[in-house]
Amino acid sequence: MGHKKYLVLLFLLAWVPAWSQVRLEHASSPQGHEALVVENRLARYTFWSDGGVLASVYLYFAPYGTKATEVVPGWDKKELLPGVSLPLEIELLGEGEGVYPDLYGIKAERKGAGEVEVRLSWQGKGLTVEKRFFIAGKAVYLVPVEVRLSGEAKGLRIILGHIPTGSKAPRIVSLCDGKPVDGFPSEEARGRIEGIGLVDAGTVYFWKFPQGLPRGTRLFHGVNRAGQPVFGLLVPELSGELILETAFYGGRNRYVLLEKAGLSSLIKLNVFGRFMVGVIHFLQFLYRATGNYGWAIIIFTIVAQILLFPLTRKQIHSMAKLQRLQPKIQKLQEMYKDDRETLQKQLIELYRTEKVNPLGGCLPFLLQFPFLILLWRAIFNSAELFHLAPSFLWIPDLSLPDPYYIIIALTVGVQLLGQWLSMRRIPEQKGQGIGWVMPILFGFLFRSFPAGLWLYYFIYSIIQSTLQAIVYWELSHKGPAKAG
């Protein structure tokens, strides 16, 4: 009865829901005014009352091969460059020119356990400004934003961001009629403007306009009052109410993540990328069917091994036959120990007669490399989806290393068992020791790899060892090859 309870507990642990709360923290801006920090499972958003801006988007979740990073342009490590404009700063034109209003009220309201609405508002001198951000705990870098302006103004600019300069600066990309355009689209080439932002190899900072630009507004790029380059929306004249509905993506530059945000056109996939995305979509299908990425990877592994089964079984047979030929091989080595050329000819003839491939033992492992590489890249490029999914057994996040190294120990143990099964029926020979050392060395060198990759290799090792046991059982009745 106790064993049944234990198995049920393990099964339920695979569906433990991940933390989805949004954390709120009140802080102070560098000028000593009110600030608000909102943290979901991937990023930390900082809002300042100074100018009512989104001051920082810090990606603190850093999957394997990446680092925590700031997305909002204008920051140099933890310092804001002098004169830089921050997102959604409003700059008045004409009379009263300047950044105005300069001090907003900040209010945060929870919309259930999984979402927070941040509201930045100001009212005075005939103008009312309200900026609303909707941050969900399990959002994949996408934040719906609404900017509402009402009153009278002789022109204003809604600054969407600072434009970095230099050789390593991100490129400016616009979306026009669903197609990416490098830089700012020319007036005559403009169609429906659907977004604009900054794209580099690691991150994307992008403002998406699902409904297009509000009537009477247009894109602009120029400099702010401090002479720093900026881009945003120009409102030539405000009379009445203007509502800007946008969605802000500030996150990693990954195709699947951008695809979920409706921004997949920002990336062009090569042939390998298409295969990788296919694997990710297959894993997502399995995840939807099972409710857990752990089971999705297990099913993916089984499917991969079924596809490779004919070749794998043939090569394991070849490897087993090679081991059974060891008495004959050792006899030839003894006979021609002083004549290596003749020895090689005799060995080649022996392999040909017995229909054995001397390299067959390596092929089952080499066949796994395409699947391992595809799965590794799939996990790397969709790590956020794994991170937001439920934990699997004792592993909290399959996109990160196993914190307890249990899956590594289990995999190494299964490989050592397979080594024992393959060696116990053949005479001891030189070089057998490497077969015992390699699994341990492999586990040590790649201990920091994602747990999802180790889960694949663990299931593969079980299947491989089981196939070896079956093949050796089939051949066990034939006995070792005679040396004579």
PLM feature spans:
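A generic structural signal for solvent-exposed, polar alpha-helical segments
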Residues: 12, 53, 81, 106, ...
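N-terminal, polar/Ser/Thr-rich
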Residues: 22-28
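Soluble non-transmembrane domains of integral membrane proteins
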Residues: 28-30, 36-264
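Helix-loop-helix
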Residues: 7, 14, 18-21, 47, ...
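Conserved acidic functional residues
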Residues: 2, 113-116, 368
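Bacterial N-terminal signal peptides that target proteins for export
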Residues: 1-7
